[in-house]
Swiss-Prot record:
HAMAP family (UniProt xref): Asn_tRNA_synth (MF_00534)
Gene encoding the protein: asnS
Matching InterPro entries: Aa-tRNA-synt_II, aa-tRNA-synth_II, aa-tRNA-synth_II/BPL/LPL, Asn-tRNA-ligase, Asp/Asn-tRNA-synth_IIb, NA-bd_OB-fold, NA-bd_OB_tRNA
Any single GO BP term: asparaginyl-tRNA aminoacylation
PROSITE patterns: AA_TRNA_LIGASE_II (PS50862)
Cell wall biogenesis/degradation in keyword set: no
Biological source species: Xanthomonas oryzae pv. oryzae (strain MAFF 311018)
Gene3D superfamilies assigned to the protein according to its UniProt record, in alphabetical order: Bira Bifunctional Protein, Domain 2, Nucleic acid-binding proteins
Catalysed reactions, as listed in the record: tRNA(Asn) + L-asparagine + ATP = L-asparaginyl-tRNA(Asn) + AMP + diphosphate + H(+)
Name under which the protein is recorded: Asparagine--tRNA ligase
Record-level GO cellular component terms: cytoplasm
Keywords on record: Aminoacyl-tRNA synthetase, ATP-binding, Cytoplasm, Ligase, Nucleotide-binding, Protein biosynthesis
Amino acid sequence: MTVVSVEHALAGKLPEGGEVTVRGWVRTLRGSAGLAFINVTDGSCFAPIQVVANDTLPNFDEIKRLTSGCSLIAKGVLVKSQGKGQSFEIQASGVEIVGWVEDPLTYPIQPKPMTPEFLREVAHLRPRTNLFGAVTRIRNCLAQAVHRFFHQNGFNWISTPIITTSDAEGAGQMFRVSTLDMVNLPRDATGNVDFSRDFFGKETFLTVSGQLNVEAYCLALSKVYTFGPTFRAENSHTTRHLAEFWMIEPEIAFADLAEDARLAEQFLKYVFRAVLDERGDDLAFLAERVDKKAISKLEAFINAPFEQIDYTDAVKLLQHAGKTFDFPVEWGLDLQTEHERWLTEEHIGRPVVVTNYPEHIKAFYMRLNDDGKTVAAMDVLAPGIGEIIGGSQREERLDVLDARMAQFGLDKEHYSWYRDFRRYGSVPHAGFGLGFERLVVYVCGLSNIRDAIPYPRAPGSAEF
């Protein structure tokens, strides 16, 4: 018995007339004059394969009762299909039914249009749909391409801790990790919670970024990256925010902001090319049902050189855009999505790297420029979504870093280990961060980031 994937069976690389076995789930079934036409999918590709069963099979009456979602093993002869829209089909010599759908009428995944809102309520079943099957395969393709890009370019992957004592962003929006009894918290002499009696002997949190930790390895191995889960306790009920998501954070030694921007451009174009090359079937479906530009926007992105513009110049352009924005445009304020999209879509028409932001709106670790008013920071903006990458050259001068930490009200003793990098062989270095789900949203043309991750975590929502 040669078990093959549906993708392999449809690819035309197996001998026609050979015996094959496929295992999967029923997508649809229709009957006609002693025949049953079963569309079977195993998730290996977008298209199902048609299994043709005739009434000479001993369990044909049972086969006719199959419904969407039932699981089976079908064996038979692989032949060229006579029908339209598929290359090969299986003339079944046997169909073993492995699992029935208990009540087809109440089965949530029906062969009809279903809204993303409804499917979020049954997130454990939504990968069975065409949409989320496609999104999941594209997400996997992107993840594999991320690791492949960095591996091919000499980077080392670093596993940074999920449990941490440091706030890399300085925003204070962190999830606390504790084994203390919340009903009977231990108190110290001042009445505050005594975290010395907690599991780690101090306050600990879920990480908001692996950047500070990965810098340590950058300053020993030169080119590193981390790719893992991060957590933000932002009470944001928007289509752009998750409480749990994955971050890609490379870091390069002996590098400035210009090199950081080049790395970001090379990286994005590489992973987009991988999706176009490997997941054309899923992109074609998304272009038909979700975002008609799903393919063309990636091709345009890859072929366009990035435009670089200073933040100060971007503000001037926006102020003279002849357009009324919902959010004010003023030097010293961060750019909003509407501003970013105007720059990329209406003014420049391709990806944009905005550099040198005001120092007070960016993180403490970003390198202070000579003007004393801006930092060597960048945001990569993409048409259709706005910011997709944020990065900077890191502050390698200890005295300047200490001053920046004081400005942000951070205890430098708490960050003594991070300061050590500037005390022992400090070098210029840079890096960036990219929310993986934002990448998935952009590629798939999704309208809500909660559809870009298998089990979304958001304020008031932690199902499954």
